[in-house]
Amino acid sequence: MLYSLLKKYLFSLDAEDAHEKVCKILKMLSSSPFLCNLIDSQWGYKNPKLENEILGLHFPNPLGLAAGFDKNASMLRALIAFGFGYLEAGTLTNEAQMGNERPRLFRHIEEESLQNAMGFNNHGAVLGVRSFKHFAPYKTPIGINLGKNKHIEQAHALEDYKAVLNKCLNIGDYYTFNLSSPNTPNLRDLQNKAFVNELFCMAKEMTHKPLFLKIAPDLETDDMLEIVNSAIGAGAHGIIATNTTIDKSLVFAPKEMGGLSGKCLTKKSREIFKELAKAFFNQSVLVSVGGISDAKEAYERIKMGASLLQIYSAFIYNGPNLCQNILKDLVKLLQKDGFLSVKEAIGADLR
């Protein structure tokens, strides 16, 4: 009831203005362990059936918040309290940048979807690291999503990723290389096997922490499989599928720029993930994101081969109860099918 009133107010505002107001509140809450514990007591959910050890990290549950919500690692404590099993901060770039011109964030309410053309707006790696350390330690694993600065030419992209990774080496539990945002000109061109190979070979020499590649949903299947194979061969520990889509046919009234996320992406993301899992299940940790908004969809992705999940748009539309609702219902679905834990259900459809 309370969130429905708050949502009505927030949805009367420009989408980015609303997000900024929420961020201010969450940052304030993150400064208070007492308030975070209060949130956790109301909206958190813990069940040993949902716990898992992946890549040496303990995940209280498989449901994470995708990168883009907390761009500067300034409200992670509060977000964890809403029931997430892990979070991904960023996208951080080597240097601070403003991103694209506003308006750049839009709602497609009937489709429960978002369209964003943000352009990696963030305070830069130095301030992101400072903020992360200020609020540490954290109760769940935290990933750091890394991107390329807009002004960096393609020929120097590898150096730029090396620079931002180097600044972030002392924070986070894993790193995700974002080559798939549609909002940085030509960034998706880096989704090729040669660059991906160079990128992960470079990163493996710099850190022993897990490394992930986040891919776009708009790749041709053969291209996607080739790129992922290159990443895994070069040392990637996991693949996150997928980022936002540029397929404007998925909503009734799309804006000219920006990637789409939310329920409009459910089918497309699921189909991409299915192909990914058929080829690489048991070879890599697979993370499914895109259009997940309830336990049924979450469970389907897990049975398809997802060790972990991420949400974003559904959190905007459904509010603070979402994690708790998904996780409670997920436990029921596991029990109904005779699984003793979520770990047993991963890849069940492939066995």
Swiss-Prot record:
PANTHER family: DIHYDROOROTATE DEHYDROGENASE (QUINONE), MITOCHONDRIAL, DIHYDROOROTATE DEHYDROGENASE (QUINONE), MITOCHONDRIAL-RELATED. It comes from Helicobacter pylori (strain P12). This is Dihydroorotate dehydrogenase (quinone). The active site is at residue 181. One of its GO terms (cellular component) is cytoplasm. The keyword Repeat does not apply. Belongs to the dihydroorotate dehydrogenase family. Type 2 subfamily. Its EC number is 1.3.5.2. HAMAP family: DHO_dh_type2. It comes from the Bacteria. The gene is pyrD. Keywords: Cell membrane, Flavoprotein, FMN, Membrane, Oxidoreductase, Pyrimidine biosynthesis. Its cofactor is FMN. Pathway: Pyrimidine metabolism; UMP biosynthesis via de novo pathway; orotate from (S)-dihydroorotate (quinone route): step 1/1. The lineage of its organism: Bacteria, Pseudomonadati, Campylobacterota, Epsilonproteobacteria, Campylobacterales. Substrate binds at residues 71, 116-120, 178, 183, 243-244. Its main location: membrane. InterPro entries: Aldolase_TIM, DHO_dehydrogenase, Dihydroorotate_DH_1_2, Dihydroorotate_DH_2, Dihydroorotate_DH_cat, Dihydroorotate_DH_CS. Monomer. Catalyzes the conversion of dihydroorotate to orotate with quinone as electron acceptor. It is found in: Cell membrane. It is a peripheral membrane protein. FMN binds at residues 67-71, 91, 145, 178, 214, 242, 262, 291, 312-313. It catalyses: (S)-dihydroorotate + a quinone = orotate + a quinol. GO terms for biological process: 'de novo' pyrimidine nucleobase biosynthetic process; 'de novo' UMP biosynthetic process. Coiled coil: none annotated.
